[in-house]
Amino acid sequence: MVYLASKIFGFLITPSNLIATVCLIGVMLSLTRWRKAGVRIGAAGILLLLVCGYSPLGNVLLLTLSERFPAWQESGRAPDGIIVLGGAINPDLTAVRGAPEMNSSAERMTAAAVLARRFPNAKIVLSGGNANPFHPLSTEAEVGRKFLEDLGVADDRIVMEGRSRTTYENAEFTRPLIHPVAGERWLLVTSAYHMPRAMGVFRAAGFNVEAYPVDWRTRGWVDAERPFLT
């Protein structure tokens, strides 16, 4: 119930959905005796849409997240393991269609495949369940394992954590599954804009990981002057 409520709340406060809600409230009020207030609220919603969509604001907000952790540079000994967070795969669509169906964060899985080949002795931990709260057909971890196996990654290298539905649960369920010890090196693979939250959650769980950001959405601070929708 808490998970479902958090998803509904998250949906409502997503900027695009929040702006749409403001506009809708404005339209509804304009049809009542509070017409003037409705017009003002609707106009404010349209103004927010223009500012967020056609100004650099969206890129600036994205950059404040994605630029906190730079691209990983290989140095020192090879990592002992690689943790790949879910969010790249649609497990239910995959179950129906019979082939891995990925979204705009697919780089999480392609990076996992590249790292698996670069570091052949590293464990690959796939942390991702199914965000469908009603009738989940599969998990991201299961689909991810099949994807990596098809690319030649040995099954005995892959560890599946298929219960997590949030970043907090990624850390909560992964740490006791692999029991990391002091001195081990673990890479954490997720989207660049998601990395600050992921690193914070894993560190809070007592799991010392190294950031391996992927799925970059900007070219860097040069995009701070570029309209968000261009």
PLM-predicted stretches and their roles:
Residues I46, V51-L229:
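A structural signal for short, hydrophobic/glycine-enriched beta-strand patches
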Residues L12-T14, K36-A37, A171, I178:
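Hydrophobic transmembrane signal anchors and adjacent membrane-proximal interface regions, especially
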Residues K7, V39-G42:
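Residue-level signature of transmembrane alpha-helical entry/exit and packing/kink sites
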